[in-house]
Design a protein with these regions (language model features):
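A structural signal for multi-pass alpha-helical bundles of membrane permease subunits
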Residues: 4, 9-240
Length: 240
């Protein structure tokens, strides 16, 4: 009967582990690592359709971009959009998570309703909100008229177009962030909350002094996700 030493057994386990991980590593190299390095290389070249091979020009593209006023204008708008969407979407997401965390017969329906905008394509959402913001006949202008306020075409004004898009984005993104906050809230031991209730703490006190501090890691993760998502929106701008 053949016996193996501890070192041989460990080597065998490691070999099996690497064999199991290899397919995932191959896919990651092909579809993640290689495109990143390829994109970096192409950003340092001059390439046009019909050329056999791109001409390497170093950092000229980056220098040209840094000297473009249009680039800095776009960056400013993007940063402004991120600032006016990240905090509101996180606040609304946390509020929704606190609501759906309560046990009731309608909890499943409410969670689905809040999350539904997340699974809708941005093109469809942008089209819906474009009709809402439509001048004169749109739902938003009709609401303003009913309140005695002069209608405004929010999508044609520099002062209102970004806030209008930000409102639409928060409406879509809040349900997505709600899922992470809900997971964080449910990971908090109920014994901690119960002990606080026995000591006479109310719902708001428990939320402010127990739930929020324990959600610090979740806040860090959610803020990173929200920042990343706010920088990669394109389709709604084209449609609206």
């Amino acid at each position: 009967m053949k016996t193996y030493t501890k070192k041989q057994r460990d080597l065998k386990k490691n070999l099996i582990a690497w064999l199991l991980v290899t397919p995932s590593l191959i896919f990651m190299l092909i579809f993640t690592v290689w495109p990143v390095f390829r994109s970096i290389y192409l950003s340092m070249t001059k390439y046009k359709l019909g050329m056999k091979a791109p001409d390497f020009i170093g950092l000229e593209n980056y220098i040209s971009l840094a000297g473009s006023s249009l680039f800095w204008k776009v960056m400013g708008n993007t940063l402004y959009f991120a600032l006016i969407t990240i905090i509101p979407s996180m606040v609304v997401g946390l509020f929704l998570a606190a609501i759906v965390n309560r046990k009731s017969r309608a909890t499943g329906f409410v969670r689905t309703a809040y999350f539904y905008p997340v699974i809708m394509p941005m093109i469809a959402i942008a089209s819906i909100w474009m009709f809402i913001y439509m001048a004169k006949n749109g739902l938003f202008d009709q609401m303003l008229s009913s309140l005695g306020i002069k209608p405004m075409n929010v999508l044609s004004s520099k002062k209102t177009v970004l806030p209008a898009m930000a409102f639409m984005y928060v409406w879509k993104e809040a349900g997505y962030l709600m899922v992470f906050f809900l997971s964080g809230i449910q990971s908090i031991s109920e014994e901690v909350n119960e002990a606080a209730r026995i000591d006479g703490a109310g719902t708001w006190t428990i939320f402010r002094k127990i739930t929020l501090p324990l959600l610090a890691p979740t806040f860090l993760f959610v803020s990173t996700i929200a920042l990343t998502n706010s920088f990669k929106l394109v389709d709604h701008v084209v449609i609206m």
